[in-house]
Amino acid sequence: MVNDTIADMLTRIRNANLAKHQIVQIPLTKVTKSIAQVLLREELINSFEELRNGTQSSLLLSLKYTGKTRTPSIQKIQRISKPGLRIYSGAKKMPRVLGGFGTAIISTSNGLMTDTEARQKNVGGEILCYIT
């Protein structure tokens, strides 16, 4: 049993990118599905699909690679707010990842969204991860 499903998801994506895997399987929870939707909206993955096998459900992510050398579109993915140390940010002090070239996924009262969307909607929340 994994305690931190978000960190588990990010680690699986990181490992699959290093091994140049096309598809990665992740345990399905509401949060992992929401993160996958944000990644799809930001065009960092090709697609995702829910798989239900009896009692266990999983999420299949199709990772995105570019060019002949198959460079992953997700170069670095890093967990920020952890179960032992939560990190929150208001709408005014929302962090910019790599000066705006990266993306932060924020958990707000309006659901999961990127830092740019949170700034536009003027909402703050918990900073889940940074993606570059």
Swiss-Prot record:
List the protein's name.
Small ribosomal subunit protein uS8c
Membrane-spanning ranges? none
Q: Which GO terms describe its biological process?
A: translation
- Report which gene this protein is encoded by: rps8
Keyword entries, A-Z: Chloroplast, Plastid, Ribonucleoprotein, Ribosomal protein, RNA-binding, rRNA-binding
Q: What does the UniProt entry say about where the protein is found?
A: Plastid, Chloroplast
Self-association or partners: how does it assemble?
Part of the 30S ribosomal subunit.
What does UniProt give as GO cellular component?
Answer: chloroplast; ribonucleoprotein complex; ribosome
Q: Which residues form a coiled coil?
A: none
Its function, per the record, reads:
One of the primary rRNA binding proteins, it binds directly to 16S rRNA central domain where it helps coordinate assembly of the platform of the 30S subunit.
Output the PROSITE patterns linked to this UniProt entry: RIBOSOMAL_S8 (PS00053)
Q: Name one GO molecular function term.
A: structural constituent of ribosome
Give the family from UniProt.
Answer: Belongs to the universal ribosomal protein uS8 family.
Which Pfam families does UniProt cross-reference here?
Ribosomal_S8
